[in-house]
Regions:
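Active-site-adjacent mobile loop/cap segments within catalytic or ligand-binding domains
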Residues: 4-6, 12-17, 71, 76, ...
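Catalytic-core regions of hydrolytic enzymes
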Residues: 2-4, 9-97, 101-110
Length: 185
């Protein structure tokens, strides 16, 4: 089973991530993706990271960065694509994890549900549910079931500190969600 883990965004522009509470999205999600890959590999899954190092820069624009991730996953023949991100809001009390899929009819929908259930169990953050988003490039251009997971809110001090200081909780939640979905947990 091949799992493509996309650590969302680039270390610098173009396509750098959100910033909040002294943290950068691209740094937080890289560390969580790296740790998730270790757990999944320990459970016998083949995992590829979109950014194998924190300095890896994909593309020269937002569009080419998204395309690089999708093309890599498609050409590798991934069975599932999971893009990890942090959320942001002007409402700093907004908290929790949520996920997006292209359609509820996809196998990505129950995968995303399992990931959110396990993230909630591991981190205690609210499960904000799975929503359909047809406008996200990484969901509509992948040839395999794909989900974009917003791990927590970088704009919320408690969420941001938890992601920065306890990345293993998020990695365990994502990995357990994948394993539960595959019937291996």
């Amino acid at each position: 089973m091949k799992i493509y883990l996309d650590a969302g965004h680039n270390p610098t522009n173009p396509n750098a991530g959100a910033e909040g509470n002294g943290y950068r999205e691209q740094d937080l999600v890289y560390e969580i993706a790296r740790r998730t890959a270790v757990i999944l590999r320990q459970n016998g899954l083949d995992v590829r990271l979109s950014r194998p190092t924190p300095e890896t820069q994909l593309g020269t624009s937002n569009a080419s960065s998204w395309a690089a991730r999708v093309n890599d996953a498609n050409s590798w023949g991934a069975d599932y694509f999971i893009s990890l991100h942090t959320n942001a809001s002007n409402i700093t009390s907004a908290s929790g994890s949520e996920a997006f899929v292209y359609t509820e009819a996809s196998r990505a929908y129950p995968l995303a549900q399992n990931i959110l259930t396990q993230l909630n169990a591991a981190t205690g953050l609210p499960n904000r549910g799975v929503s359909v988003r047809t406008n996200l490039y990484v969901l509509r251009r992948t040839r395999m079931p794909a989900t974009l997971v917003e791990l927590g809110f970088i704009s919320n001090p408690a969420d941001a500190d938890l992601m920065a200081n306890q990345p293993q909780l998020f990695a365990r939640g994502v990995a357990n969600g994948v394993l539960a979905y595959l019937g291996e947990l």
